[in-house]
């Protein structure tokens, strides 16, 4: 290479070092930004340049997160008018304005303002804000944060300024490939306290509820468990207000709030592995504004449903029956409205208040400042126009002087709303309650009489035939259980390590009795199950559990460490499970978030592994007979362990099924043939596994899930969902972002196969394992039976049936 070539190469290398990757620090009159060039923030978090949505021919100037794929655009300059050729510049013109021009100097976009300074430059700040700066005073003359598109970043805000007629909102894209303004706008209202709204054109689409210092009352998910935190500053006298948000855990500054073209407001952050949706609204059809019409209550169940508030009836029964609820409801009884101003308003000829819990406060409220809760009620009672009031600790007194619209009830969270009714509504309700209470009292008395008689008969027979009376010494028990190689603990040790069964050591309460935590001398933690005298688990079940668990060892079965029998005390000692039972997670609004879909799928597979061992791989063939979510324990790593073998039965040789005259189990989990004929087999456990599988997917209890006027059960709802959409929409909405649609749909189909009415139509556990771990084609399930309705109680019910006449003879909490 000659000297000239060497000099040229060195010069070129020098220029590349000085001006790398066609990126530079600022836009000036002399240095415009052209297609193919980018402007980066100082630390390289954001980047400004030209882009084409989904590789369309249209070019836009936008800001996005740098070096993150796929590209997330957070601001667009020329969203109304794209550049359609490859010759365009973002520059500062002679009038002192930032403009986008294409061929022949046609102005595509400008900031709409001009400045007289001769030293103007445009920079992209590290917070993602594009600013036009006066180089003389170093003052920001214009900034993109004051002209938002569909996205708000950490240091930007939506706001209103009434005196100056200004409002800063988020405006959705028209569609994912067209950034021009769509039909949705997110804004902050001027009410006191303010609300967040999504408007669809000129009509409300979603409402966040009154602001309560740190949360919107219509978003119960804003419970402090999320990484994002909102803040609203409102100056009522000045007529201004603004909303910003920040990240509580600042291990990442990559976050944005966006309004999608479908009308969904999402707060998204990057946890280092990818983008995660922290909060989203709306998430349910109940969230859509005024779904149930005036004085209608939208129940945020799955799926949502509408009801009239107490004391109200549908305006049109015909429309209501068609599920067209927008007409709402009307009062059944007019208010007396004697302008009462004291507590005597509760008298029969006055008006009263009915309290509705867990609701989003209605729209169109009035804030009454500086009064307490009692005065709030009296102010409403003394005003004939007042239809309801709510006293919210972080707000104060809110009253409503018109129809109640956009009222929603949550499963948990929300506020308390007191609705004004005619006193006759309460009187009628009280009469019904008295009648019901009388019937229940008489029924309970009769049941107790018969139960006492049969219990006396049962105890008399037990005294004649029981091979080991409760009073028998521990030595006799040792002799009886000697072949099982069971460890015996003495009672004094148990009393010491449980601090005399103190409340501090109590882990929980089951139908069998309490469970306590203890620490052995070597520091090992154990769980002690203490059989209570009122438990439905008798001597037979106690012995059964010891004999079975002592012979069964598997990573997905709870391990028995020993027992203690002294006098009437019977105790079982197990390995300690740090996370208690599965039901404490999936049915808890906060804890359920710790079990995303991948973890739930692992738990499902673990339970199936445990059942496979019981049915096929152990030295015994065991039918559990009481598979349910509360009998699945979780260790410190959330590995599932099947527990409670008191009702389990062993099968011998070629035996595949058995019959019992004493049907025991938990309502909702019992297969049809077992509940009504006493016939049980491995397929009985498969049925219960199917129910359990659907509970894990949905996060809903079989014992409390009913929807619609016809009272559909969880199983029926799962069947309808599978028929309509393949079942992928069944996943618990609180963790839906973590789920694989195909995986969820597959598990729903497996669950439906497991709950088939005929035992022969259900797969065995080996087939279930293959279905869960392979991509084999699944058979189509038949419509399951939905005959058995289950009512929720404080504890799950273990039910015993006499199969002679299929009548319930005893119910024992379990």
Swiss-Prot record:
Residues the record lists as Phosphoserine modifications: 535, 550, 630, 643, 703-704, 797, 802
Disulfide bonds: 286-298, 292-306, 376-397, 380-386
Limits of the PAN domain: 337-423
Topological domain spans for side Extracellular: 26-433
Domain of life (superkingdom): Eukaryota
Start and end residues of each EGF-like domain: 282-318
Chief place where the protein resides: membrane
Listed GO CC annotations: plasma membrane
Record membrane topology: Single-pass type I membrane protein
UniProt topological domain (Cytoplasmic) ranges: 455-814
Catalytic site positions: 626 (proton acceptor)
Residues reported in the UniProt entry to bind ATP: 507-515, 529
Domain Bulb-type lectin: 26-145
Glycosylation sites: 43, 54, 89, 95, 253, 271, 324, 334, 340, 383
Gene Ontology MF term list: ATP binding; calmodulin binding; carbohydrate binding; protein serine kinase activity; protein serine/threonine kinase activity; ubiquitin protein ligase binding
Known EC number: 2.7.11.1
A Gene Ontology BP annotation from the UniProt entry: recognition of pollen
Signal peptide: 1-25
Cross-referenced PANTHER family: NON-SPECIFIC SERINE_THREONINE PROTEIN KINASE (PTHR27002:SF1088), RECEPTOR-LIKE SERINE/THREONINE-PROTEIN KINASE SD1-8 (PTHR27002)
Protein family: Belongs to the protein kinase superfamily. Ser/Thr protein kinase family.
Name of the featured protein: G-type lectin S-receptor-like serine/threonine-protein kinase At1g61370
């Amino acid at each position: 290479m000659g000297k000239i070539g060497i000099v040229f190469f060195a010069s070129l290398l020098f220029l590349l070092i000085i001006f790398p990757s066609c990126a530079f620090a600022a836009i000036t009159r002399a240095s415009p930004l052209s297609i193919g060039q980018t402007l980066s923030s100082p630390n390289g978090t954001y980047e400004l340049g030209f882009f084409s949505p989904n590789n369309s021919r249209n070019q836009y100037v936008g800001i996005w997160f740098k070096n993150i794929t796929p590209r997330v655009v957070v601001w667009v300059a020329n969203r109304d008018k794209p550049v359609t050729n490859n010759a365009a510049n973002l520059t500062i013109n002679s009038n002192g304005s930032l403009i986008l021009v294409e061929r022949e100097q046609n102005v595509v976009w400008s900031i709409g303002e001009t400045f007289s300074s001769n030293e103007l430059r445009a920079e992209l700040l590290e917070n993602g804000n594009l600013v036009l700066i006066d180089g003389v005073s170093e003052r920001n003359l214009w900034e993109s944060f004051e002209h938002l598109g569909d996205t708000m970043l950490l240091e930007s805000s939506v706001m209103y300024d009434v005196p100056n007629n200004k409002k800063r909102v988020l405006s959705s894209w028209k569609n994912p490939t067209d950034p021009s303004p769509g039909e949705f706008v997110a804004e902050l209202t001027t009410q006191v306290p303010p609300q967040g709204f999504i408007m669809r054109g000129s009509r409300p689409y979603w409402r966040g509820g009154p602001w309560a210092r740190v949360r919107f009352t219509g978003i119960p998910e804003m419970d402090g468990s999320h990484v994002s935190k909102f803040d609203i500053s409102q100056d009522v006298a000045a007529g201004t207000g603004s909303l910003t948000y920040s990240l509580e855990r600042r291990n990442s500054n990559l976050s944005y709030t966006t309004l999608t073209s479908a009308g969904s407001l999402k707060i998204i952050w990057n946890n280092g592995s990818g983008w995660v949706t922290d909060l989203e609204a709306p998430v349910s059809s109940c969230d859509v504004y005024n779904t149930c019409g005036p004085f209608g209550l939208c129940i945020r169940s799955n799926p949502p449903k509408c009801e009239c508030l107490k004391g109200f009836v549908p305006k049109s029964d015909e429309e209501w029956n068609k599920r067209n609820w927008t007409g709402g409801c009307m009062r059944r009884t007019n208010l007396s409205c004697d302008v009462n101003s004291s507590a005597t308003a509760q008298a029969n000829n006055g008006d009263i208040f009915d309290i509705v819990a867990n609701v989003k406060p209605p729209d169109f409220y009035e804030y009454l400042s500086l009064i307490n809760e009692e005065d709030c009620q009296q102010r409403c009672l003394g005003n004939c126009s007042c239809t309801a009031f709510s006293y919210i600790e972080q707000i104060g007194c809110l009253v409503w002087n018109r129809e109640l619209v956009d009222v929603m009830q949550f499963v948990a969270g929300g506020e308390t709303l007191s609705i004004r009714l005619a006193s006759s509504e309460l009187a009628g309700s009280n009469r019904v309650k008295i009648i019901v209470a009388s019937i229940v009292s008489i029924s309970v008395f009769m049941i107790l009489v018969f139960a006492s008689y049969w219990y006396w008969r049962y105890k008399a027979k037990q005294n004649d035939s029981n091979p080991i009376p409760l009073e028998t010494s521990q030595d006799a028990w040792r002799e009886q259980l000697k072949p099982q190689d069971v460890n015996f603990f003495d009672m004094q040790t148990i009393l010491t390590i449980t601090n005399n069964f103190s409340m501090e050591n109590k882990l929980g309460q089951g139908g069998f009795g309490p469970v306590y935590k203890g620490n052995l001398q070597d520091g090992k933690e154990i769980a002690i199950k203490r059989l209570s005298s009122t438990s439905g688990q008798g001597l037979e079940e106690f012995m059964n559990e010891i004999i079975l668990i002592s012979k069964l060892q598997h990573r997905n079965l709870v391990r028995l460490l020993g027992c203690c029998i002294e006098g009437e005390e019977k105790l079982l000692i197990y390995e300690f499970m740090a996370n208690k039972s599965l039901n404490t997670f999936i049915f808890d609004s906060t804890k359920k978030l710790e079990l995303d879909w991948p973890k739930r799928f692992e738990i499902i597979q673990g339970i199936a592994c445990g059942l496979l061992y019981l049915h096929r791989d152990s030295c015994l063939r065991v039918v559990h007979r009481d598979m349910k979510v509360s009998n699945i324990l979780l260790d410190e790593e959330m590995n599932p362990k099947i527990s409670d073998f008191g009702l389990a039965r062993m099968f011998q040789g070629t035996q595949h099924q058995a019959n019992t005259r004493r049907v025991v189990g938990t309502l909702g989990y019992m297969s049809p043939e077992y509940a009504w004929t006493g016939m049980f087999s491995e397929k009985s456990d498969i049925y219960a596994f199917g129910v359990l599988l659907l509970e894990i997917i949905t996060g809903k209890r079989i014992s409390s899930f009913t929807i619609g006027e016809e009272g559909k059960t969880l199983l029926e709802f799962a069947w309808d969902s599978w028929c309509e959409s393949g079942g992928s929409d069944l996943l618990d909405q609180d963790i839906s972002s973590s789920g694989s649609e195909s995986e969820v749909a597959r598990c729903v189909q497996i669950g439906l196969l497991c709950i088939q009415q005929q035992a022969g139509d259900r797969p065995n556990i080996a087939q279930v394992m293959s279905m869960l771990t392979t991509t084999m084609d699944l058979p189509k399930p038949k419509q399951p039976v939905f005959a058995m309705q289950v009512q929720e109680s404080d504890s799950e019910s273990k039910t015993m049936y006499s199969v002679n006449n299929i009548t319930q003879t005893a119910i024992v909490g379990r």
